[in-house]
């Protein structure tokens, strides 16, 4: 994503959630953030995005994915009792992440992987080998668009599938979010997923605050009454 597009999205997220004072309770005091504070959060968001090498998704797009029941994994990184149990994006799993990468413990990383891996899409991988064939067979296979090759010494081969097996698809769409645009928990978890080789990771910057402010439905964890 181009830098100006990241800036535009970050600004849009900041302004869209800025109408709710609760969103910025952990970052600013007062009903409206100062322009200097908005600038700091915006550029910090941009720098995190560049460093994390993940993609970004806005509220409307995520809402469309949820409504369309897209195949994806949504990760809420907020503490369970304080946030996730009360409200979360429908279908989201909960794996808590800290505000900085240095504070991300081995147990927290393991918890994220333990929950994500079983939910990944599956894909079939083919193990192939080049098998020697006659010139006649080579021509026949080539006409049928099979993968073939001919060596300089006129030895003919075709690519034969010797084994098929199913593996987890690391290109599965994964969306990570936390509380609001100034919250770095989602950055920490999203950046970690990218480092683990996942290639389709999105950070939902506005988080649960933007989701709720947009009037979207939420799920919650029902706790038994005493």
Question: Whereabouts are the PLM-identified features?
Answer:
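Bacterial N-terminal signal peptides that target proteins for export
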Residues: 1-9
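Flexible, polar/low-complexity N-terminal or interdomain linker segments that lie immediately upstream
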Residues: 16-88, 222-226
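Second-shell loop/turn segments in exported
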Residues: 46-53, 99-106, 162, 179-181, ...
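Sec/Tat-exported extracytoplasmic proteins
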Residues: 49, 66-69, 81-82, 96, ...
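Mid-length scaffold segments of soluble, non-membrane domains
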Residues: 77-126, 167
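Solvent-exposed loop/turn segments at secondary-structure junctions
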Residues: 79-83, 99-102, 180-184, 207-211, ...
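Catalytic cysteine-centered active loop of the rhodanese-like fold, especially the PTP/DSP P-loop
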Residues: 110-134, 158-210
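Extended amphipathic alpha-helical heptad-repeat regions
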Residues: 131-150, 157
């Amino acid at each position: 994503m181009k830098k100006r597009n990241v800036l535009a999205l970050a600004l849009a997220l900041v302004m869209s959630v800025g109408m709710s004072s609760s969103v910025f309770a952990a970052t600013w005091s007062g009903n409206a953030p100062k322009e200097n504070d908005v600038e700091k959060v915006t550029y910090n968001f941009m720098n995190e995005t560049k460093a994390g090498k993940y993609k970004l998704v806005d509220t409307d797009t995520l809402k469309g994915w949820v409504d369309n029941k897209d195949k994806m994994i949504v990760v809420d990184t907020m503490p369970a009792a304080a946030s996730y149990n009360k409200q979360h994006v429908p279908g989201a799993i909960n794996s808590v992440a800290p505000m900085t990468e240095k504070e991300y413990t081995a147990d927290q990383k393991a918890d994220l992987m333990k929950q994500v891996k079983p939910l990944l899409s599956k894909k079939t991988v083919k193990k192939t080998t080049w098998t020697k064939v006659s010139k006649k067979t080579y021509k026949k296979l080539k006409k049928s668009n099979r993968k073939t090759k001919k060596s300089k010494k006129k030895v003919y081969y075709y690519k034969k599938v010797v084994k098929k097996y199913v593996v987890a698809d690391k290109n599965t769409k994964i969306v990570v979010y936390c509380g609001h645009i100034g919250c770095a928990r989602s950055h920490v978890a999203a950046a970690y997923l990218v480092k683990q080789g996942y290639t389709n990771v999105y950070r939902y910057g506005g988080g649960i605050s933007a989701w709720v402010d947009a009037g979207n439905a939420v799920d919650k964890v029902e706790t038994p009454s005493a």
